[in-house]
């Protein structure tokens, strides 16, 4: 079991970015369908942060982008800049071994904006003391990320969530570009 108590996460499967780069969660050990992952753990929890250059192949395995899971905001409305009609946020639901008292969550995000990749523009975090089907507390944490237009390095986006308790955390990550890429997620919590 992981030190932060995550026992599973559920989310949409990553997507292909051209013929050479697959941004899938290749190591996911739960139920895998063509478009959705549930009941397991994978690359978002493997302890490996992806390189800023998502095409980097550190072990020469032929898998460019291997350390990243990515999703495309491919609607025509998004390309035209119509925020109201963009793809819905990427929803990741994390399940923990027991009820925890959280202090922060870290998302290692890519920000290679010259390639249409940015960290999420907003994250909304919901907490539940029960399973994902039990419903969430009424006060989510809303975090607005300040867009970085200068530095293209991948970075940890750290969201403070002091004194929030839960056994399930739902993170809705909102697109700020054509692509959203995450390579690692880490929670800080106590019991």
Regions found by a protein language model. Give the residues of each.
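Contiguous beta-strand segments within globular domains
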Residues: 101-106
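Trp- and acidic/polar-enriched beta-sheet ligand-binding modules for extracellular glycan
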Residues: 13-16, 24-25, 29, 39, ...
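Disordered, acidic Ser/Thr/Pro-rich linker "stalks" and the adjacent N-terminal cap
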Residues: 1-98, 110
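Helix-boundary capping/turn motifs
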Residues: 97-100, 161
């Amino acid at each position: 079991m992981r030190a932060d108590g995550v026992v599973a996460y559920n989310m949409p499967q990553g997507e292909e970015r051209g013929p050479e780069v697959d941004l899938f969660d290749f190591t996911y050990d739960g139920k895998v369908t063509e478009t959705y992952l549930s009941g397991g753990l994978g690359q978002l929890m493997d302890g490996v942060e992806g390189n800023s250059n998502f095409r980097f192949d550190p072990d020469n395995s032929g898998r460019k982008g291997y350390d990243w899971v990515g999703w495309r905001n491919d609607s025509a409305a998004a390309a035209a800049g119509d925020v109201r009609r963009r793809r819905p946020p990427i929803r990741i639901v994390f399940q923990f071994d027991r009820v925890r008292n959280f202090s922060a969550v870290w998302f290692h995000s890519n920000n290679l904006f010259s390639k249409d990749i940015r960290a999420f523009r907003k994250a909304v975090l919901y907490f539940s003391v029960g399973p994902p089907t039990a419903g969430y507390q009424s006060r989510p944490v809303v975090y607005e990320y300040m867009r970085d237009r200068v530095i293209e390095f991948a970075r940890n986006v750290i969201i403070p969530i002091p004194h929030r308790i839960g056994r399930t955390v739902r993170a809705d990550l909102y697109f700020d570009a054509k692509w959203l890429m995450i390579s690692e997620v880490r929670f800080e919590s106590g019991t």
